[in-house]
Amino acid sequence: MIPLLMGAGISLALVMIGTQLFIRLLIRKGYGQFIRDDGPTSHHTKRGTPTMGGAVVIGTVILAYLLTHLISWWINPKAPGPSVSGWLLLLLMAGMGLVGFLDDFIKISKQRSLGLNAKAKLILQAAIGILFAVLAINFADHNGRTPATTKISFARDIPGLDLAFAGAGLGVLLFVIWANLIITAATNGVNLTDGLDGLAAGASVMVFGAYTLIGIWQSNQSCGSPRAVSSTVCYEVRDPLDLALLAAIIFGALIGFLWWNTSPAKIFMGDTGSLAIGGAIAGFAILSRTEILLAIIGGLFVLITLSVILQVGFFKLTGGKRLFKMAPLQHHFELKGWAEVTIVVRFWILGGLLVAIGLGAFYAEWVVF
């Protein structure tokens, strides 16, 4: 528990300081957010606000992860070092952040709303997702456990649902496709949510808080752990405590970033941050074997994504009519006259309730047990 608190504290402090310095740098360089003319008129005042703040979050998370392990090793030379699961999650987070950075940089340098086109963005996301999935299904430990598995999971692996039903080769291929669906959905879900000051960062804080608790519990009830209640209900998740550490570090980093990102925002996370955060959330779901549960824990991102899908589908089916005043959903309420802060806080409440329901679903079997 001490390393988790230490990691969260280090990342919080580093982001608080680093973001302020980054804001000054971006202002000096003239790197500000471009605002679309067809968006809510209230957003025009945000034109020129520094963006790409996600770069600070990504860099801080990596640094805090290494520092926490270094300090833990200095205190106790027998303390475990960075895990394969930890490195894989950082790879996915940084890789998606790089895609977002390219998108942000094109927008800023050319002062337009379009960065990478949709096809290029999806291709880059898929390439990183494939690399992550292939690596995650390899690197077995001495117990034969790989960071990820071909089994489909809810709060744990679902009996009888294994993508390797027709052999290992097909199982790996199907897992790569399955993992990429989760990664693409999560990254774009967070990206769509990042439309109001503090909305995506605040909602993500609660999700990473949930994965911190999940990782701690999975570690305590890990197969082979002396604290496990029973070998029949233990978890076979690889490196759960290190995943909990990373979740706590990202939790702290986002709280620090939220200090500067809350309304009126001094900096935006940009696609650099939203894609990185979405990638990390997907990584936690895959590596902690809670893939379907993510639809509840990250339910706010699901609802906002669905609002876009419904808007586009309704528009095409009705020949130009709109279901919402504007999509994503948060902009619909803006155009209805809700204050930005009101929308953000109410969406946080909704997101928090969904996280609580997700945690309840995760722990439900233990209440019954």
Swiss-Prot record:
Catalytic activity annotation: UDP-N-acetyl-alpha-D-muramoyl-L-alanyl-gamma-D-glutamyl-meso-2,6-diaminopimeloyl-D-alanyl-D-alanine + di-trans,octa-cis-undecaprenyl phosphate = di-trans,octa-cis-undecaprenyl diphospho-N-acetyl-alpha-D-muramoyl-L-alanyl-D-glutamyl-meso-2,6-diaminopimeloyl-D-alanyl-D-alanine + UMP
Record's subcellular location: Cell membrane
GO biological process: cell division; cell wall organization; peptidoglycan biosynthetic process; regulation of cell shape
Cofactor(s) this protein requires: Mg(2+)
E.C. number(s) listed in UniProt: 2.7.8.13
TM region positions: 2-22, 55-75, 82-102, 120-140, 163-183, 196-216, 240-260, 267-287, 292-312, 349-369
Gene Ontology CC: plasma membrane
A Pfam family matched in the record: Glycos_transf_4
InterPro entries hit by this protein: Glycosyl_transferase_4 (IPR000715), PNAcMuramoyl-5peptid_Trfase (IPR003524), PNAcMuramoyl-5peptid_Trfase_CS (IPR018480)
Pathway: Cell wall biogenesis; peptidoglycan biosynthesis
Predominant subcellular localization, coarse grouping: membrane
Swiss-Prot/TrEMBL keywords: Cell cycle, Cell division, Cell membrane, Cell shape, Cell wall biogenesis/degradation, Magnesium, Membrane, Metal-binding, Peptidoglycan synthesis, Transferase, Transmembrane, Transmembrane helix
Membrane topology classification: Multi-pass membrane protein
MF annotations from Gene Ontology: metal ion binding; phospho-N-acetylmuramoyl-pentapeptide-transferase activity; UDP-N-acetylmuramoyl-L-alanyl-D-glutamyl-meso-2,6-diaminopimelyl-D-alanyl-D-alanine:undecaprenyl-phosphate transferase activity
Assigned protein family: Belongs to the glycosyltransferase 4 family. MraY subfamily.
PANTHER family to which the protein is assigned, alphabetical: PHOSPHO-N-ACETYLMURAMOYL-PENTAPEPTIDE-TRANSFERASE, PHOSPHO-N-ACETYLMURAMOYL-PENTAPEPTIDE-TRANSFERASE HOMOLOG
Function according to Swiss-Prot or TrEMBL: Catalyzes the initial step of the lipid cycle reactions in the biosynthesis of the cell wall peptidoglycan: transfers peptidoglycan precursor phospho-MurNAc-pentapeptide from UDP-MurNAc-pentapeptide onto the lipid carrier undecaprenyl phosphate, yielding undecaprenyl-pyrophosphoryl-MurNAc-pentapeptide, known as lipid I.
HAMAP family according to UniProt: MraY
Protein name, as recorded: Phospho-N-acetylmuramoyl-pentapeptide-transferase
Organism in which the protein naturally occurs: Renibacterium salmoninarum (strain ATCC 33209 / DSM 20767 / JCM 11484 / NBRC 15589 / NCIMB 2235)
Upper classification of the organism: Bacteria, Bacillati, Actinomycetota, Actinomycetes, Micrococcales
